[in-house]
Amino acid sequence: MSSAIHNRLALLRAERGLSRKALAEAVGVNFQTIGYLERGDYSASLELALKLAAYFEVPVEALFSLEPFESLFKR
């Protein structure tokens, strides 16, 4: 089993027209942290995962997963 945590952070951020900086300020982290999360270079702490889910008003499992998310686009 892979230890990677997959997320939809970039997708949700783009849907709402948010910059990394704006999202980072809203949840109290450095904007670089958002980039690290989006690229999978860093896994969010439970506290940060909960803050991000609350900000986007989605369940944590809609934002983060142990399994890759299915593509939203059909091939």
Predicted regions and their residues:
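Short alpha-helical DNA-recognition segment
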Residues: 17-36
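Short, conserved catalytic or interaction motifs in soluble domains
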Residues: 39, 58, 68
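DNA major-groove recognition helix of helix-turn-helix/homeodomain DNA-binding modules
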Residues: 47-62
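Short, charged recognition helix plus adjacent turn
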Residues: 54, 64-75
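Alpha-helical residues within the helix-turn-helix
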Residues: 14, 25, 54
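Residue-level signal for the short linker/turn that defines the boundary of a DNA-recognition helix
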Residues: 7, 17-18, 44-47
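A short, Lys/Arg-rich alpha-helix, primarily the initiator
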Residues: 1-15
